[in-house]
Amino acid sequence: MNPIRRIALVALAFAMADAPSWAGPSNAPPPPTTRTDPNGLLLNQWFSEGTAAGHAGDDYDNRDGGHSRLDLAKYPQLRPLPYLDSQRVGKKDYGPPREIRTETVFGNASLSGSALGGASIPRMMASTREGLGFLAGQYLANQLYVFPEHQDHDPAGEGLSGYGDLYAVNPPYLVISQGSSGSDQPFLDAIAMTMASFNPEVKEMLRKEKLLMPVVQQILRTSLKPLKQREDYLTALAHPTAFPADWLDEERMMRAAQSLTPLTLPPMLQLEVMREPAPPRPGIDFFEGPAKESESLSDRGIVVARIVRGMGWERELTVRVTRTREWAGRPLQIHWRLLRGDPDLVTIERSATAPEATIRVKWHSGPIEAPGGIPGLSGHRVEIGVFADNGTDFSPPCFISFYFLPNERRTYDETGRILETDYAFPGSFADVTLTAQKPWRDRYRYDKDSGAPLGWTRSENGKAPVDFDADGRELLPEGPRRLTYEEDLVSRRLRFIPAE
């Protein structure tokens, strides 16, 4: 397998020939697949009987210059997503998607940056509010993409070359394949076969409702080979950040899609943050450049996400279930499940009067086990799954996540007060998509009598210590001075300078 190279530098490979066109009679559409394996024969049988929709109205989008292109000769009804020549010249068909199309689209791009100096496409896009919002818009517009994790989801430790699960968010808006170039191919085949297997009436209904891809996601996850019983869907086993290809059960996915009727579609739900304490203050409670001055990545929709930046020991969110849908009007039960995180440090308190829960997450000091995925994997994300249940089927997943920056080593006292934060300890990893490198250590001071915060002292190798007051001002003989923080975009180091 060829390694994936950096996005925006060079494509890994170019120019596979376009798929040949079907040469059948104009009034007789080709079958949905030329595959002759049992799944291919089954799909063509359904199509000939009129119970499978095939790929009419579906487009495929390859965004890596043909490096890992789906073989469209296997799917003669599937149309390559059209681009104008001017769009191709402008590379609008290359790299991360940049627009929400009106067509029904699934696609891929086997492109990535390295784990340390860059990121995979999903990690890059899910690390900003704008990126997550764009992915949500795609997902709810009948568009689904597959991207390899490359170096962003591999076990770390002695004798291992990986860095753990580096994703701040587990984005259900797309599919992440475990591996590098070509690892996306089995997923493209499975998605193509699933999309063609829907009953025509059901598929058109989902297309109009803009809910086709959430149902495809639900089918993929409920059909995974490791799931042995219904309740397994409510565990991390069904929701790894990146999926191994050998977990796919293509036939099961096809049969699940084929069996759906307008009244047996899986339920739907979304989330919204209802209450939250005042956010931490940049330059006082945490330190980042202008583009990273918020803890919030998403407050509503399919994902609620926070980057834990402020020095507080605990985070609290009250999240409400909204926009539920049950196609046959059946009652819904809502499940709130801790998928990742120390259960002694996470509480989920459900309301007795409203469809909401208050979630409290205390500081997690070390790597967080990532159960359910590949063995030996850990990360830095606490994750809660929220699912609607109609008694027969579960909804596609919604996630609430809290990400703890791996380049921070914090010490708290027994009451939860911050005592010290070391940003430059040996082996620390600064995720350039989320934080800057900070070559210092902060030790916090408190009034001995009242316990009120007095400020902190910043130590950096080769420099004199710098004292700050509780408002983040540098203490100088002539008086306190306000500072501003800037990130050097080349070195990714944070510096503090006098505010103008």
What are the roles of these predicted feature ranges?
Residues D389-F394:
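Short, solvent-exposed loop/turn segments at the edges of extracellular beta-sandwich modules
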Residues S395-E500:
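Extended alpha-helical scaffolding regions
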Residues P200-K292:
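Catalytic cores of secreted or luminal carbohydrate-active enzymes
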Residues W22-F187:
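Long, solvent-exposed N-terminal ectodomains/accessory regions
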Residues L271, P279-I284, E293-R309, G329, ...:
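Low-complexity "stalk/linker" and mucin-like segments enriched in Ser/Thr/Pro/Ala/Gly
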Residues I334-W336:
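Short beta-strand elements bearing conserved aromatic residues within extracellular beta-rich modules
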Residues R320-A328:
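Acidic, Ser/Thr
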